[in-house]
UniProtKB/Swiss-Prot annotation:
Residues 5-149, 154-294, 300-444 form the Jacalin-type lectin domain. Optimum pH is 6-7. Low activity at pH 4-5 and pH 8-9. Inactive at pH 10. It comes from Parkia nitida (Black nittatree). Keywords: Lectin, Mannose-binding, Secreted. This is Mannose/glucose-specific lectin.
């Protein structure tokens, strides 16, 4: 089960629409279509569940690309990271131009070789990729990953900086990082930390007696969650060292400290908590990385879907509270989509039939956190459009304050969940031409949504 995830990325352009995929078990197969750029991507996990295809909507035959299939022999082998490059395609859109998949045993790719654009890679250890997210339309516009620590471990990002430094450092805190003490001027001379229990770590660096820098002390409030770092590294007095640093919480950014110069680094992670640091130091701070774990939580409960077995499996679990649901309906439920308060959008589920994708758009807005989704109800029945399907024909959504719907007509077999003291944390089911089945993930309102 998925006990907690960290969202990393995405990298790429802003075209297309949001999507996300989270595997029920380990990712075992990835299919991409490539030609000049990455056209589309799809996934299969160890339970046999298959995602939809993300991207590949350009109708021109010469833009379909060539299929490349990656087989991952889970659980002996597991996916741990990705790398690639992004650039303009046809002079208009920024898309994924090359892509590699990194497991604990080998690297698959790169698929396509593109010399220009912006490259991306994630120096990450002690983690398993449990899903993907980003944007797609005609092509794969952007790509990010959901990461989960290897059991009993945190995830290690980095280090960034140079190879020198005689003194390696490595620590994790049992509480939270409270004080950060930096000596900096034209580079990061040294750094030290103190946790909420008063334990001190460092100082790391600062061994040049003629250049100790200027002290800067930053206090992280206990209401903030320290989630990432950013900075630059480059040449300083003949050494490749960290030249500037920023510390990012869920509330604000502390820094930058010193003057940014050289190569920039950042890691866009969400739903995370920094629990420690690692790196190398000597006269200066030569390199730095972070240990990260998901925010604490007990997970969600899976409630089986209502409907039939047509279409393909899908699932969506929110990072935070669900605040928007969009449904197209006309005779049945054609294609729902979801969004949460962190901005994470699901892919549109169903609606594949180009001649019957629902005439009426319905939007449910939920004012989270004062209002939160607690249950769903609806109906499923046979629906005929040339062929006969059993699909979800009506759907309603219940919050702690109100009921929205039912949307579309009431007919045949009804379903509802008489559950209490809970919050809906996500949805799952089956979809193809229409919404064939739908179920929910629930949790108690005061626990995290991940599982």
């Amino acid at each position: 089960s998925l006990k907690g995830m960290i969202s990393v990325g995405p990298w790429g352009g802003s075209g297309g629409t949001h999507w996300s995929y989270k595997a029920n078990h380990g990712v075992t197969e990835i299919i991409i279509h490539v030609k000049d750029n990455v056209k589309s991507i799809s996934f299969k996990d160890a339970s046999g569940d298959i995602s939809g295809t993300f991207g590949g909507k350009d109708p021109r035959e010469n833009e379909k690309g060539y299929e490349k299939k990656i087989k991952i022999h889970f659980p002996t082998e597991y996916l741990k990271s990705i790398s690639g490059s992004t650039a303009d395609y046809n002079g208009v859109l920024v898309t994924i131009r090359s892509l590699s998949f990194i497991t604990n045993l080998t690297t698959y790719g790169p698929f396509l070789s593109f010399g220009g654009g912006e490259s991306f890679s994630i120096p990450i250890a002690d983690s398993v990729v449990v899903g993907f997210h980003s944007r797609a339309g005609y092509y794969l516009d952007a790509l990010g990953i959901f990461d989960q620590p290897v059991p009993e471990k945190t995830v290690s990002f980095g280090p960034w900086g140079g190879p020198a430094g005689d003194d390696a450092f490595n620590f994790k805190v049992g509480s939270w990082i409270k004080d950060i003490i930096i000596y900096a001027l034209a580079a990061i001379n040294s750094i030290a930390f103190k946790d909420a229990n008063g334990h001190c770590y460092g100082k790391f660096g600062g061994q040049d007696p003629n250049d100790i820098g200027v002290e800067k002390k930053e206090i992280v409030d206990n209401l903030e969650h320290f989630k990432s770092i950013a900075g630059t590294y480059g040449n300083y007095k003949g050494f490749e060292v960290v030249t500037s640093l920023s510390f990012i919480t869920d509330v604000t950014k502390h820094g930058p400290f010193s003057h940014a110069s050289g190569t920039a680094f950042s890691i866009p992670i969400f739903g995370s908590l920094v629990t420690g640091f690692h790196g190398k130091s000597g006269w200066y701070l030569d390199g730095i990385g972070i240990y990260v774990k998901p925010r604490a939580g007990q997970g969600s409960i899976f409630i089986a879907p209502h409907g039939q077995s047509g279409g393909f499996p899908w699932s969506y679990e929110a990072n935070e509270g669900i605040n928007a649901i969009v449904i197209y309906a006309s005779g049945n439920i054609s294609k729902p989509a979801f969004r949460d308060t962190s901005g994470l959008n699901s892919a549109t589920q169903g609606g594949v039939n180009p001649k019957d994708f629902g005439e009426k758009k319905n939007t449910v807005s939920i004012l989270h956190p004062s209002s939160f989704l607690t249950s769903i109800g609806g109906q499923y029945a046979q629906y005929k459009f040339k062929d006969l399907f059993t699909t979800v024909t009506g759907l309603g959504f219940t919050t702690n304050l109100a009921t929205f719907g039912p949307f579309d007509k009431l007919s045949a077999t009804s379903f509802s969940q008489p559950i209490h003291n809970n919050m809906v944390a996500g949805f799952h089911g089956r979809a193809g031409d229409y919404l064939d089945a739908i179920g929910i993930f629930v949790k108690t309102p005061d626990t995290a949504v991940f599982r």
